[in-house]
Structures are given as structure tokens and as C-alpha cells.
């Protein structure tokens, strides 16, 4: 099984299922188990266990098997974690993040910004000129924003992601 203490895996799972979901995974019994057994073993509320299992199933990180009780006709859902494919999920997530950072980086590089000194708004030059460089919220004169620090942070983050390939 994949180590849920690996910071990259843990960060991905945290984003996907939250802290209670991670707690559930860490305390989940081995093999096929019911959601009630998972809730009892992990101490996580049953509705959160079910929500987490459905999210993990949608992302192919958990497998569900239905079993019908022959006497009552009731269905029992048996769950088992399958984190064997998490590496491909991490690669997809990295690509998504890289794409979004590149879009933001290009936007920051290609634009000139004006901001309200009170922090009300941040506009590109075109929008700022439409309101005559006056903040529409508070009426203060908007100031040119040097976004070079933001551009550098975005570039550094993109470089770090590329270096981790």
C-alpha cells in the first residue's frame, strides 16, 4: 500500500478527502469491510466515512462490492482501499497545477495592474482607465502595482515543478 505519510501523497489526499478522510484511511481495517466497520474502527462519523468512500471510489482509489443477503434481500456494500494507482493521480494533478500556474504566470507577465491603496480592487490597465484610475469602491486614486514579486514566485514554483519530473 502507498504510504499516506509521504508528504506529496498526504497533500493530495488531504485536498481530495480532508483530514477526517485521512484519519479514516489510516485506521481502516484490512480487506473488504463495511462502512459501519470502518466508522467503528476509525472513530469517524458514518456519514463522513460514506462521503469519503464515494469520493475515493469516484477517483478509483477504493473498490466497492455489493453483496445481497439471501434471507432479508438487503444489500451490503463491502469496501477496500486500492491506492496502487495513486501515482497516476499525482501526475495528473501535477499537470493540472502546472497548466494553471502557467496561465496565471502569463497573465501576470502580460498585464499592467493598478490597485486601490486600501486593498479594495486590482484592475488591469484597461479596466483602471475606464474608471479614470479611481477606485469604484472607495474613491481613492489607484496606484501602479509592481507585480514582479508575484511573477518571480510563480516562475520559481513552475521551475520547482519542472525540476521534480
From Swiss-Prot:
Pfam families: TFIIE_alpha (PF02002)
Gene3D superfamilies named in the record: Winged helix-like DNA-binding domain superfamily/Winged helix DNA-binding domain (1.10.10.10)
InterPro entries in alphabetical order: TF_E_archaea, TFIIE/TFIIEa_HTH, TFIIE_asu, TFIIEa/SarR/Rpc3_HTH_dom, WH-like_DNA-bd_sf, WH_DNA-bd_sf
Domain HTH TFE/IIEalpha-type: 5-87
Record-linked SUPFAM superfamilies: Winged helix' DNA-binding domain
One of the GO biological process terms: transcription initiation at RNA polymerase II promoter
Record carries keyword Ubl conjugation: no
Task performed by this protein: Transcription factor that plays a role in the activation of archaeal genes transcribed by RNA polymerase. Facilitates transcription initiation by enhancing TATA-box recognition by TATA-box-binding protein (Tbp), and transcription factor B (Tfb) and RNA polymerase recruitment. Not absolutely required for transcription in vitro, but particularly important in cases where Tbp or Tfb function is not optimal. It dynamically alters the nucleic acid-binding properties of RNA polymerases by stabilizing the initiation complex and destabilizing elongation complexes.
Domain characteristics, as noted in the entry: The winged helix domain is involved in binding to DNA in the preinitiation complex.
Family: Belongs to the TFE family.
Record's protein name: Transcription factor E
Gene behind this protein: tfe
Amino acid at each position: 500500500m502507498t504510504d499516506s505519510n509521504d508528504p506529496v501523497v498526504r497533500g493530495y489526499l488531504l485536498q481530495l478527502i480532508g483530514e477526517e478522510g485521512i484519519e479514516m484511511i489510516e485506521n481502516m481495517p484490512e480487506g473488504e469491510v463495511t462502512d459501519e466497520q470502518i466508522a467503528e474502527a476509525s472513530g469517524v462519523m458514518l456519514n463522513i466515512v460514506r462521503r469519503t468512500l464515494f469520493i475515493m471510489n469516484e477517483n478509483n482509489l477504493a473498490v466497492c462490492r455489493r453483496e445481497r443477503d439471501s434471507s432479508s434481500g438487503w444489500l451490503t456494500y463491502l469496501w477496500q482501499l486500492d491506492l496502487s494507482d495513486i501515482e497516476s493521480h499525482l501526475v495528473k494533478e501535477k499537470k493540472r497545477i502546472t497548466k494553471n500556474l502557467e496561465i496565471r504566470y502569463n497573465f501576470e507577465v502580460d498585464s499592467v495592474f493598478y490597485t486601490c491603496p486600501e486593498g479594495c480592487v486590482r484592475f488591469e490597465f484597461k479596466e483602471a482607465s475606464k474608471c479614470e484610475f479611481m477606485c469604484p469602491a472607495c474613491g481613492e486614486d489607484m496606484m501602479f502595482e509592481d507585480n514582479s514579486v508575484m511573477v518571480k514566485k510563480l516562475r520559481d514554483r513552475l521551475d520547482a515543478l519542472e525540476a521534480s519530473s
